[in-house]
Amino acid sequence: LSVEPRPAFYALGGGGWRDYVTLLHPPYTLWHLSYVVIGAALAPSLPVERLAWGLVAFALALGVGAHALDELNGRPLRTSIPNGVLAVTAGVSIGGAAVIGLVAAFAWTAWLLPFVAFGSFIVVAYNLELVGGRFHSDSWFALAWGAFPVLTGYVGATGTLRPEAILAAAFAASLSLAQRHLSTQVRDVRRRATRISGQVVYKDGREEAVVAETFTRAPEAALRAMACAVVALAATLLALHV
């Protein structure tokens, strides 16, 4: 008897409230919220209130809104959350994040305005695969989910851009690109593969059957470790301001 694999290693089965937890993609949401912390923590003096509001905005737009749109667009997580609930959740979350960004721009620095505009656009364009999926690519993921949170966190904290922020954004973009490459293979196996077969024969005569875990075990272990590493790095930089 074959058992259908979970759509993601962090997916909870059973429906109900578990679907809403799964929808948040917990390890990835923490990962990308950590980029906001990293950006803000590069500031000479960390304005805690600005960081807190930045985290709330990204938690709404990325953690909730983006993932609700993604689930609305093809049900990759196979949740039972109604379409209407997903649509309203996405609209309220992304709209709330945009309002926070606009208020912050007028209260702190106008340099946040282009970041609010870009974030509001890319969260919809990427997850709904608008313009024929042109924005749903590895490079756009690296920029939007990696570099963008770092730069926004830094600009929100300082009102300017400096070389250290650009370098940190390059770090986040590169790491997010690695995340994308690893997770793409895992998603293909978990969500699209209907049959996997084969055998690995080693030089010493050992034989090993090729199963789904052959393609998911190592990438998922790497993704878990990378998520923990980014969160730890963000916490370390934050601790420097305590």
Language model features by range: what are they?
Residues L1-S80, V85-V123, L143-V242:
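Hydrophobic alpha-helical transmembrane segments
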Residues L128-W140:
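Membrane-helix interface "capping/anchor" motifs
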